[in-house]
Swiss-Prot record:
Disulfide feature: none
Gene this chain is encoded by: tlyA
Organism of origin: Brachyspira hyodysenteriae
UniProt keyword Ribonucleoprotein present: no
Keywords for this protein: Cytolysis, Hemolysis, RNA-binding, Toxin, Virulence
Stated role: Bacterial hemolysins are exotoxins that attack blood cell membranes and cause cell rupture by mechanisms not clearly defined.
Name of the protein in question: Hemolysin A
């Protein structure tokens, strides 16, 4: 059996993806040795120990946590929109920092963890493409704070929609993933960008396109956790 299957089946996590998160975070030990490979094969005789010390429902929450520390932002009593919510790492982080309500939007289905799905401060919006966002969908509770973590699409494709439909926002913090902003030929086999100069160029280009939409960049920083394949990612802070 795979290690992630075991961790989930034994009830340590609410989903297999959450099991993978805690394995990657170094919280699972096999016979006293830390194992960070989710596909690690285990035997019936192996001793598995799970040390639960993750603050949020996924590692993504730890990424957004750095924005609170470095950017000096506050979401206390604010209505927020989490674009690309997935299992809810960003949403969980927002709630723990005092958000009044979070709209958790994702193009996928049934990914948000159970505890967030059943939290009355969370509105789950599934099977929804971020490019279709409009202010009418929020009734009278239009978000003033936006956070985003999207994959397989350039964040620059979403920026103009945010600027047009949600231009009352106080700030937007987004994860920028150079591997999804790069030209096809810039990404090496395996989907990893290893060239530091190229990565910086891709980041600057993406931020320039967002600024061209009408946003102002306030700050940027390196994400404290790399992407699933080991890519360096960034957090950027924008206002209008």
């Amino acid at each position: 059996m795979r290690l992630d299957e075991y961790v989930h089946s034994e009830g340590y996590t609410e989903s297999r993806s959450k099991a993978q998160d805690i394995i990657l975070a170094g919280c699972v030990f096999v016979n006293g040795v830390k194992v960070t490979s989710k596909a690690h094969k285990i035997k019936d005789t192996d001793n598995i120990e799970v040390v639960q010390n993750i603050k949020y429902v996924s590692r993504a929450g730890e990424k957004l946590e750095k924005a609170f520390v470095e950017f000096g932002i506050s979401v206390e009593n604010k209505i927020c929109l989490d674009i690309g919510a997935s299992t809810g790492g960003f949403t969980d982080c927002l709630l723990k920092h005092g958000a009044k309500k979070v709209y958790a939007l994702d193009v996928g289905h049934n990914q948000l963890v159970y505890k967030l799905r059943n939290d009355n401060r969370v509105v789950s919006i599934e099977d929804f493409n971020a490019k279709d966002i409009n202010k009418e969908m929020f009734n009278d509770e239009i978000p003033s704070v936006i956070v985003s973590d999207v994959s397989f699409i350039s964040i620059t494709k979403i920026a103009p929609i945010i600027f047009k439909e949600l231009n009352n926002l106080e700030f937007w913090v987004t994860l920028i993933k150079p591997q999804f902003e790069a030209e096809r030929g810039d990404v090496s086999k395996g989907g990893i960008i290893r060239d530091d100069i190229l990565r910086e160029k891709i980041l600057n280009n993406a931020i320039s396109k967002i600024i061209d939409c009408g946003f102002k960049e306030v700050n940027r920083t390196i994400s404290p956790i790399k992407g699933a394949k080991g890519n360096i990612e960034y957090l950027a802070h924008f206002i209008i």
